[in-house]
């Protein structure tokens, strides 16, 4: 049964069955994997968005390909493992692992085909813009001579020709390894031989040829094309009978034993095993001779349904390298983040700025430097006595790590929770942990069974004969690089209650002291799920008693069945539910009798939406100064609520509360230029401004308007709420 049939059946059920039956059955959920593929389709659609410069469109295409690679490494690998183990347990939406895999393969086939079609179109747009991708037949004599010289000096020394025969068995190919397969024949006697050339991973995929000096035209050739021109240099005495490229993806899930004496060594061993995970996808250039393809497939023990013929370019995730060409006119205009004005008002003293009033910093519109500055100032301030920090992901040469090391070397008490289980950052985190330990930092690794995903810093400072606790908590990682492109929130406060709560969270992580006396925050896996359900059910009760009831939630993924069912119940009670979900959404919006009052949108644009914001009207509707407003590191997924340490932090200060609710959330709900409306079948359609309504772009808005918790006086006439009211007045005047 294909995906269209499944959707048609589900739509028919939604039309003919009572809502009570739908609510009780698996039909009320959208399949998680198919929902993710719908999300990646939205990312891919940005590569055909004519409003984006062409190199940004190439970047979106590359991102969609990279996303798909990771999806296979983790999600598809997990489903295949279930099938191998004979597991037939159904997903919440009622599909067995085998049924899910069939639907995934069908959807991926269409997605991958569309990626290639879009790439062919983009090549034409690039050519029209003066960026030409060359085949071997396209180069001039002079260019071929230059390529040969470049090949001999910069590529040839990195290549190892690998003959395959009884004395030279088929070599190990790493995950994402790009390889040229060859059918050769010896010139002297015609004796056949198969061979491989693995493309080196640490050099650029695209080679830029010298310009002619007369115009801006950029001429580019791929590494594999250049290598193919000079295969004779690698296999002298042989001629090529057939060739083709292939690329593999391996299972990248880590298997961790529950009993371990040394967690670091355990992870080092597991990482070595992961490099040799089984092949789950083999992409093959469709021009490769069948005999050669079968030879490679058997050597890699890839099943027939794991082999994908590609009529186009392999490793599309590497297309982002093309954006390095010096053509700023073909990219987004660079954006320089603002620095919070209140910190400037205090001469850069971050502690003085926080003492004056709580502060929300909205990344990437406001600089992540203020987070780095918070820790650097703490490291150098003689009155700071202790620092505690969680690290889930950070950047190479991280200023966060340097600040913690500097603080320890200055004699301060520094504790760092380094999460070894951060997927694909495990090796980097082991390295950071050892660097920090050498500097004198007390490094802990949290729980074996739980990932610590909370974003939390705590600084204890001696002030006026007593100790003051300053905290930073946020929705994003302590990663200065991703903070330039991810939308996230950083919250700074010296509120003593939140300071005590943060200290209890750290005690929980470092000493297993379960925080039963937390006052304002909520922590998973202990109280976060309970807190969310209490608020959702509270709004349901308000609606049933005729009071205003509203829920606004912004997150990356909505998967948890219990949370979804609570939202369905709220909708049936009459609660207005507005959801902004960037990625996976297993909730079906707009189903009569089930989710009539739930609207779901997804924002895909220049920046990656990453912040989690949870707002509840509290009996007053939304927006309201009396609403309950939180930010969090947690999405609404079982893993976040039950298998991770996460923090849900309330916005208690009125200015911060207003900024998050009435500026940030309202702007996200108002966006029409980058938003997609999710439909009951799990697909989505691009939103458009209503007739007479001015289009609104949330990213452009925040790039050009200051935040409330900086100083924000200039915001009063241009806030999203004010703009909304103005538009409503104009529509009212037009209709009258």
Curated annotation (Swiss-Prot):
Cofactor: Mg(2+)
PTM (free text): An intermediate of this reaction is the autophosphorylated ppk in which a phosphate is covalently linked to a histidine residue through a N-P bond.
Superkingdom of origin: Bacteria
CDD domains: PLDc_PaPPK1_C1_like (cd09165), PLDc_PaPPK1_C2_like (cd09168)
Signal peptide: none
Entry GO CC: polyphosphate kinase complex
Chain sites annotated for binding Mg(2+): 393, 423
Family membership: Belongs to the polyphosphate kinase 1 (PPK1) family.
Protein name, as recorded: Polyphosphate kinase
Organism name: Rhodopseudomonas palustris (strain TIE-1)
